[in-house]
Amino acid sequence: MTNAFNTNLSQAVFNAAQDLMPGGVSSPVRAFKSVNGDPIVFDRVKGPYAWDLDGNRFIDYVGSWGPAICGHSHPEVIAALQEALEKGTSFGAPCELENKLAGMVIEAVPSVEMVRFVNSGTEACMAVLRLMRAFTGRDKLIKFEGCYHGHADMFLVKAGSGVATLGLPDSPGVPRSTTSNTLTAPYNDLEAVKALFAENPDAISGVILEPIVGNAGFIPPEPGFLEGLRELTKENGSLLVFDEVMTGFRISYGGAQERFGVTPDLTTMGKVIGGGLPVGAYGGRKEIMSMVAPAGPMYQAGTLSGNPLAMTAGIKTLELLKQEGTYERLESLSQRLINGICESAKKAGIPITGSFISGMFGFYLCEGPVRNFQEAKQTNAELFGKLHRAMLEKGIYLAPSAFEAGFTSLAHSNDDIETTIKAFEASFSEIV
């Protein structure tokens, strides 16, 4: 594919977009700045593949940043959406589909006894922070360096995702007063969390984290870390919140909390539960969720929340994921892929460390292990940029950032994985 690789139409559309939208994109990481390139403009997606405007086909490991766990445009999801479209695109009123998806989430996720649907992961995290404060009567929050909880002001402190990709310390426009109650600790460091509790007695509403960090690359929790946080929050009368926007229904049907056997008080979700349509949700113990309006005094609302199309896509996606062998297959695909990537890099003499859990994986171009964001920043981002371009030319679409997780889907075949590993072998040899 390298000799015929042509992105003229993508380039033309992106050039025009820069006069119409800030940076030419609707979300910063899509601009390819951290890989020193120009973005590929997609025309259509199907299964594990994406096609750009120039007709290039890519094996896709971004999966719309996580939602496409069953593959893009799954025929059963599309059929369900076509039927739902006939009934309308938005009601602005209760619909029965909300009940069905809510019931499926409550049945699956250990921490969730009640759930509220919103339109994005950012919305879910904003609302859950307000709820934490309302329930505990405390203002302070502990988050972890490199964890990303959306672009709300109070979370843009040592954040991951696009903030990490662009190397931004924080964001202009966020008042110091807004983030003064946001405390940070290194991921996988229980002692740092203990110190924050000791320094702020009876002041911390809760601890929020990605149970697997996917917005600073891929950093799994060390044994005992999540369990330790659960114990610390209980001891201090604080809440534990898992941001499972990325890991929910991807790591296992019940999310990371089911996989690791640690149950938080509250959980935020998104991505997979919308089946590719905009959605978010937050849920938890009934005692806490009963504070949300109109049942309780904590206000949160949304015009398009519980949108019937998003509910439809989410229901069908979760039905597909409940089928036997789903997560075993995702685990097998990710294991073969990450093992092949690491072996290929080592053959080329390139330092690498990589890991995976279920349908989620990541690697860093440095010596491992990587246990936190500071260690993640040791990755060779410049070399990753060269790798990204080389892989594009071979028909492989990776996240355009050294600080984002990758995703396998049920649509990826063993042949797709082998093709990808061969592309890595060739690309590592080219860039060394």
Curated annotation (Swiss-Prot):
It is found in: Cytoplasm. Keywords: Chlorophyll biosynthesis, Cytoplasm, Isomerase, Porphyrin biosynthesis, Pyridoxal phosphate. InterPro entries: 4pyrrol_synth_GluAld_NH2Trfase, Aminotrans_3, Aminotrans_3_PPA_site, PyrdxlP-dep_Trfase, PyrdxlP-dep_Trfase_major, PyrdxlP-dep_Trfase_small. GO terms for molecular function: glutamate-1-semialdehyde 2,1-aminomutase activity; pyridoxal phosphate binding; transaminase activity. Its cofactor is pyridoxal 5'-phosphate. The keyword Isomerase applies. SUPFAM superfamilies: PLP-dependent transferases (SSF53383). One of its GO terms (cellular component) is cytoplasm. The modification N6-(pyridoxal phosphate)lysine is found at residue 271. Its main location: cytoplasm. GO terms for biological process: chlorophyll biosynthetic process; protoporphyrinogen IX biosynthetic process. It holds the Pfam family Aminotran_3. Its EC number is 5.4.3.8. It catalyses: (S)-4-amino-5-oxopentanoate = 5-aminolevulinate. Belongs to the class-III pyridoxal-phosphate-dependent aminotransferase family. HemL subfamily. NCBIfam families: hemL, PRK00062.1. HAMAP family: HemL_aminotrans_3. Homodimer. This is Glutamate-1-semialdehyde 2,1-aminomutase. The gene is hemL.
